[in-house]
């Protein structure tokens, strides 16, 4: 997090490095990278963090499984293709890490009640970027699209299940994503913070061999959902 904050501060340092310059957020700024949005294709990279949760639907009403999530990190690259003046197609493959702990009710033993679910995802989002009219060196935008995750931490091929303390999730999942951000044009590059939600479409849970398993028997579906915050540099 300290490194991410330091990178954010670089933008403002560049903006204020000369006393006689007009800053990005001034009333009448000098227009930076004026022809950038006319580029057909451009690339960048991003750093960020995430908070993954699980949406659990049950077959019958009963005590809910509690999910403790922690803040993970993201890193990846961006390929952007301009389709028209206000519409871009973006591909943002990256590595995402997250960790969750499930607390099951009605277990006397902590060994049975707790299940740790780690995720090391290769994230493949394909997004449409809808940009507004540029105002000075600021250009807000909306994002929407679909994504697929390959979970490198998945143990889907394991023959063991929760009876052997093995909680299993599928390797591939699909999601839809919605969010917004802002392009900030500095003298040498574009800094683009964004926030979006990712919502799982497919069920990720692999059931235990016992259909009446106290860990998976009452679960209709288990889908990931996440808040993703990225700081992109072009």
Which residues does each predicted region cover?
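Bacterial Sec-dependent N-terminal signal peptides
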Residues: 1-24, 231-234
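Short glycine/proline- and aromatic-enriched beta-strand/turn motifs that initiate or cap beta-hairpins
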Residues: 19-71, 234
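Short, well-ordered amphipathic alpha-helices
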Residues: 28-29, 76-77, 125-130, 180
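Gram-negative (and chloroplast) outer-membrane scaffold detector with strong preference
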Residues: 37-41, 49-55, 80-155, 230-234
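Residues that define the transmembrane beta-barrel architecture of outer-membrane proteins
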Residues: 39-41, 69-73, 118-124, 138, ...
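Flexible, solvent-exposed loop segments that connect beta-strands
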Residues: 54-67, 98-119, 150-170, 205-220
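Intrinsically disordered, glycine/charged-rich N-terminal periplasmic/extracytoplasmic linker segments
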Residues: 65-83, 88
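Predominantly the C-terminal beta-signal and adjacent terminal strand-loop region
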Residues: 181-234
């Amino acid at each position: 997090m300290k490194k991410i904050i330091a990178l954010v501060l670089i933008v403002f340092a560049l903006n204020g490095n000369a006393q006689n310059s007009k800053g990005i957020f001034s009333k009448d700024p000098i227009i930076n990278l004026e022809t950038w949005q006319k580029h057909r294709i451009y690339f960048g990279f991003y750093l960020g963090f995430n908070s993954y949760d699980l949406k659990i639907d049950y077959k019958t009403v009963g005590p809910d499984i509690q999910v403790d999530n922690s803040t993970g990190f993201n890193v990846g690259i961006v390929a952007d293709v301009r389709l028209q003046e206000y519409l871009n197609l973006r591909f943002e493959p990256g590595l995402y890490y997250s960790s969750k702990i499930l607390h099951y009710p009605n277990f006397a033993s902590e060994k049975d009640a707790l299940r740790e679910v780690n995720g090391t995802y290769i994230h493949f989002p394909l997004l449409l970027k809808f940009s507004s009219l540029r105002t000075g060196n600021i250009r807000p935008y909306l994002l929407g699209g679909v994504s697929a995750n390959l979970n490198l931490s998945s143990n889907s091929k394991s023959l063991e299940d929760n009876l052997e303390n093995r909680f299993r999730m599928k390797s591939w999942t699909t999601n839809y994503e919605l969010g917004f951000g802002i392009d900030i044009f500095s003298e040498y590059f574009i800094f683009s913070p964004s926030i979006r939600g990712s919502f799982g479409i497919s069920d990720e849970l692999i059931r235990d061999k016992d259909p009446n398993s106290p860990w998976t028997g009452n679960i209709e579906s288990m889908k990931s959902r996440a808040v993703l915050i990225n700081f992109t540099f072009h």
